[in-house]
Amino acid sequence: MAKDLQVTTSKVNDNQTQLTVKVPVEQIQNKVEGRIRNVAKTAKIDGFRKGKVPVSHIRAQYGAGIQQEVINDVIRDTVFEAIKAEDVRAVGMPNIDDVKLEDEFLVYQATVEIFPEIKVEGMSDIEVERHTATITDEDVDTMIENLRKQRQEFAEKEGAADEGDQVTFDFEGSIDGEKFEGGSAEDFKLVLGSGQMIPGFEDGIKGLAAGEEKTIDVTFPEDYQAENLAGKEAQFKINVKKVEEAKLPEINDEFLELFGVKEGGVEQLKTDVRKNMTREIKNAARNQVKQAAFDALLEKNEFDVPSAMVDQEVDRQRNLMMQRFAQQFGGNANSIDKDMLPRELFEEQAIRAARLGVLVSRVIEENDLKVDQERVETFIKETAENYEDPQEVIEYYTNDAQQRANIESVVLEDQVVDFLLEQGKVTDKEVGYQELLASQQQGMM
């Protein structure tokens, strides 16, 4: 810590601490004088040769500004030393105020938000429902049918559009007779039953054939993302140009080769599909029970988190969504207007994530949990199995310290889940494959 730095702390509230920092005024004066002399050596001022400007002239003309610069630098250099010296677990940047230059000290106050000091309660009272699933032959057949649908092609048909058909049409929307932005399109393609449009839109198209027109009445949902449209009644004029029905590919050698099956025919495809589904439900089951355990832990521990932690989590979630948008639609994530993703979209989940982060950290500290390196190695190997060259992936995670640290963090979080399940009451429930996947997704929302 800087020489002769004096620090006292006082609690503002459960999430804030205030530090009063005193820096000997001699340190300020010495820095100011040193900087004035340096300026005098290089200053170009009319009437003086370069380097010959009297120090007294620099002090008189620039001294106040130089002193303020030095004070700002000293505060910046000492505030984090003070935080560290007082063992304050700060989150976010400190807020500096009440800066005073007294006869003996530069005095300032730094208010910082702090990591919540809580004791985890109710672990033995946690009740968790753990979902398990067994993959049936019917599940495998359904998955293969879905693989066929993913590669389906559409062929033009005569007659009315029905569920599963792809319809190409123009539409023009209006509210109270006035067109609105984004309410019109030409040659729009829609697979009926996809749920892509607002309620009532697809139903209005069913039964129409190519060349037919219709005006349909719909109501935008109350929670529609465009607030200016939410809850509004609208009319859409539809002009159907083409109706196509789906044609599923046959399960032949060509289809099998798409999935790397060169020998063994359909039975080998079923074996491979079952293997992938087994891995999928293993991950889904783990995620479901993790979310259930964390939800139960959050319910037993009510506390507020610093706004800085929530802000950081909002930024993290927003950046992830921007990256997903860029990957899905092309372009650079940095080019996406953040105003399109307002804070309100993320705040509820951000608060939950921040609170959960505190609880997980406290469970680890209170129970002295250490990362299990054997589990880390197993995690790396299982991850590597999904790649073409597993050994290369293993070496990557083994040799890259940051990547290994990320995996250790994931594994340690899994160990926290195991610890919670050991402390609480767990009830197993057998569910179907699709239900397990759905319960996992619900928990992640």
Curated annotation (Swiss-Prot):
Pfam families: FKBP_C, Trigger_C, Trigger_N. GO terms for biological process: 'de novo' cotranslational protein folding; cell division; chaperone-mediated protein folding; protein transport; protein unfolding. Disulfide bonds: none annotated. InterPro entries: PPIase_dom_sf (IPR046357), PPIase_FKBP_dom (IPR001179), Trig_fac (IPR005215), Trigger_fac_C (IPR008880), Trigger_fac_C_sf (IPR037041), Trigger_fac_ribosome-bd_bac (IPR008881), Trigger_fac_ribosome-bd_sf (IPR036611), Trigger_fact/SurA_dom_sf (IPR027304). Its EC number is 5.2.1.8. GO terms for molecular function: peptidyl-prolyl cis-trans isomerase activity; protein folding chaperone; ribosome binding. It is an enzyme of class 5 (isomerase). It comes from the Bacteria. It is found in: Cytoplasm. Residues 164-249 form the PPIase FKBP-type domain. Keywords: Cell cycle, Cell division, Chaperone, Cytoplasm, Isomerase, Rotamase. It catalyses: [protein]-peptidylproline (omega=180) = [protein]-peptidylproline (omega=0). Consists of 3 domains; the N-terminus binds the ribosome, the middle domain has PPIase activity, while the C-terminus has intrinsic chaperone activity on its own. Involved in protein export. Acts as a chaperone by maintaining the newly synthesized protein in an open conformation. Functions as a peptidyl-prolyl cis-trans isomerase. Belongs to the FKBP-type PPIase family. Tig subfamily. This is Trigger factor. It comes from Psychrobacter sp. (strain PRwf-1). The lineage of its organism: Bacteria, Pseudomonadati, Pseudomonadota, Gammaproteobacteria, Moraxellales.
